Amino acid sequence: MKKLVIATIMAAVMMPANAQKKGGHGYPITPVEFTKVKVTDSFWGQRLKASREVTIPLAFSKCEETGRYTNFEKAANPSESYKVGGLSFDDTDVYKTIEGASYSLQTYSDKRLVQYIDSVLDIVAKAQEPDGYLYTSRTMNPKHPHEWAGDKRWSKEE
């Protein structure tokens, strides 16, 4: 399951790169894959370094601190005793942080970050329902989901 989640995230990350127009007849510019670019100038290089060293770790620590992972842990073991709190879209903070860290890993190797992402993906994968559905605000307490979730799956798609 973890491999499926990783493959899905990587596919989503790589799709925009594959969708770019390739250089060819009448098109003077050939796109470069972002994994082939090394930004080292003093302006953007420093910002990418700050993202890697400060922003990504801070974002993951905020996910821990604010209970984002707890929602997934509860969804992995649903119970009517769980009171669904917070915002129904809190899960996206976890997904976007994984996405940002994954982009960073494409250009800067970091074994500790890979291990940490794997540990988060373990938590996320355990929260998925057997058919792959995942919405912690509904899954952690299916009989009493978050008020914005609707009475059944897909009932509030708008």
Please give the residue ranges for each predicted region.
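Sec-dependent signal peptide recognition
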Residues: K2-T8
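A periodicity- and composition-biased signal for non-globular, repetitive helical segments
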Residues: T8-I9, S102
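Hydrophobic h-region of N-terminal signal peptides that target proteins for export
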Residues: I9-N18
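Glycan-recognition and catalytic cores of secretory/periplasmic carbohydrate-active enzymes
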Residues: Q20-E158
